[in-house]
C-alpha cells in the first residue's frame, strides 16, 4: 500500500499544484481495481470534475466510478477488419449494440482510428484503413457514447508512422 499512497500523492500533486484536468492511465487493467477506486475517490474530493481515462477496456473499471472513459479497442480492431474486408460492416452495428449493454450509461468510450501504439507498430490510418479512413474517422464522432481521439497530425491528413522511442518531429504545417 505504500506504492499506492505514493502514486495517489503524485497524482494529487498534479491536481493541486498544476490544475491538470485528469489522467490517462496506461494499461489500467494491470493495476488492482481497488487502487483505482480508492484513488479516484480521493482525487475527486480535490477536483470533483476530474477526468479519468483508462487505456484499457475492462468493464470493472467503471463499477465504482474509478474511470470516466476507456479505449474502444474492440471497435478499433473491427474498423480495421471492415476496411480490409475481413468482416462485414454489420459487425460495427453489432458491436454498438453489445457495447451499449456491456458498459454503464455513464461510461464514455474513446473512439479512434489511430493512436501512438497503432501508428508506431501497425502503421498510419492511411496504410491500415486505406480509402475507408475518412468514413471511419466520421464514425468515431457519431458512435454512441463515443469520445473521438484525434491523434498527432490527423487534423491535417499527415500520413506518417512515428518512431515510438525516437524523436520524430512533425513538419511545420501552414
Where do the PLM segments sit?
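Active-site mouth of glycoside hydrolases
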Residues: 1-12, 16, 24-27, 56
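Aromatic/hydrophobic pocket-lining residues that form the small-molecule binding cavity
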Residues: 4-7, 36, 133
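Active-site-proximal helices and loops of the catalytic beta/alpha 8
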Residues: 16, 26-109, 130, 139-142, ...
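Short loop/turn motifs at secondary-structure junctions
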Residues: 18-19, 146
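Short, solvent-exposed helix-loop connector elements
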Residues: 121-128
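Short acidic/histidine-rich active-site segments
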Residues: 150-156
